[in-house]
C-alpha cells in the first residue's frame, strides 16, 4: 500500500464562522455528511455548512469522529484542524442488538433496573439478534419476551454503535398489556411507562438516544435512521448532543 492508496487516518474539522463545514455525499440509502479529507474518498463532493442544531440531526460519518466533534462543540470547545478518524462500523460487531421504541399515550416503554444503592437506570426493550434472524424479527421476539406485548415493526429510527455492539432501534406499534413479572425475561428489570417528555433527564441507555426520542416525538421521526456512536459511560451528566 502506497501513501497515495492508504486510507486516511485523519479528517479536517473546518468552520465557516459558527458553522461546521462538511462534504455532502450519497450512498444507496441517500445523503449523508462527511468530514473533508485529503484522500480520494469523494472528489468534488459539494460542501455545506451546518449550525450545531443542524449537525446534531445530520447523518455524519464516521460516527465516532462525529460524536467527538459534536460533544466538544456542544460543550463550548469545538475542535479545529485535523482530528483522528474513528469509524465503529469498520469492524465486525461483537453483538447485534434490536430495540423497540414503544410509545403509548405520551409515554415510552422502558425496562427499569434498580441497583443495590436504590439508584435506577433504564434500557429500551430489546436484545441480541440470533442466528437466522433479522433485526426486525428479533425486535418483535424480544418485545414479547421482555414485556408480553405483541409488536408490529415500523421504521428504523436509529443505529447506535456502543461498546463494540451495533444496535438497531425501531418504532414499534404494540398491542396488549404488560405481562406479570414472573412471565417476563428481563434479567431483573421491570417494564415501566415513562412520560416521553422526561426522557432527556432519564438515565437511559443509550444516552445519546434519550433526548432525540423526545425531540423526534415532538417534531417528527427521521426519514432515515440516525447514525450515532455512543461512548458515554455515565448516565448522570446531561446529554444534549
Enumerate the language-model features and the residues they cover:
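Acidic, metal-coordinating catalytic segment for phosphate/diphosphate chemistry
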Residues: 1-11, 73-99
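Hydrophobic, helix-prone linear segments
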Residues: 1-30, 64, 203-221, 240
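Conserved Nudix-box catalytic region and its N-terminal flanking loop in Nudix hydrolases
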Residues: 16, 20-45, 103-145
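Unchanged
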Residues: 40-79, 87, 129-152, 160-208, ...
Amino acid at each position: 500500500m502506497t501513501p497515495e492508496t492508504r486510507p486516511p487516518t485523519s479528517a479536517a474539522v473546518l468552520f465557516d464562522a459558527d458553522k461546521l463545514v462538511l462534504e455532502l455525499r450519497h450512498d444507496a440509502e441517500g445523503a449523508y455528511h462527511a468530514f473533508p479529507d485529503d484522500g480520494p474518498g469523494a472528489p468534488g463532493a459539494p460542501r455545506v455548512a451546518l449550525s450545531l442544531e443542524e449537525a446534531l440531526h445530520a447523518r455524519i460519518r464516521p460516527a465516532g469522529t462525529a460524536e467527538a466533534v459534536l460533544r466538544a462543540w456542544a460543550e463550548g470547545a469545538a475542535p479545529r484542524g485535523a482530528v483522528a478518524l474513528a469509524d465503529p462500523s469498520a469492524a465486525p460487531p461483537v453483538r447485534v442488538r434490536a430495540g423497540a421504541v414503544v410509545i403509548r399515550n405520551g409515554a415510552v416503554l422502558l425496562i427499569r433496573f434498580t441497583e443495590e444503592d436504590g439508584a435506577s437506570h433504564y434500557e429500551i426493550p430489546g436484545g441480541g439478534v440470533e442466528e437466522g434472524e433479522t433485526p426486525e424479527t428479533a425486535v418483535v421476539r424480544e418485545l414479547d419476551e421482555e414485556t408480553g406485548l405483541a409488536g408490529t415493526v415500523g421504521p428504523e429510527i436509529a443505529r447506535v454503535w456502543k461498546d463494540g455492539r451495533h444496535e438497531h432501534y425501531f418504532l414499534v406499534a404494540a398491542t396488549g398489556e404488560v405481562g406479570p413479572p414472573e412471565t417476563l425475561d428481563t434479567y431483573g428489570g421491570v417494564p415501566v411507562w415513562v412520560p416521553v417528555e422526561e426522557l432527556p433527564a432519564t438515565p437511559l441507555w443509550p444516552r445519546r438516544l434519550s433526548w432525540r426520542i423526545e425531540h423526534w416525538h415532538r417534531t417528527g421521526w427521521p426519514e432515515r435512521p440516525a447514525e450515532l456512536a455512543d461512548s458515554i459511560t455515565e448516565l448522570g451528566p446531561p446529554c444534549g448532543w
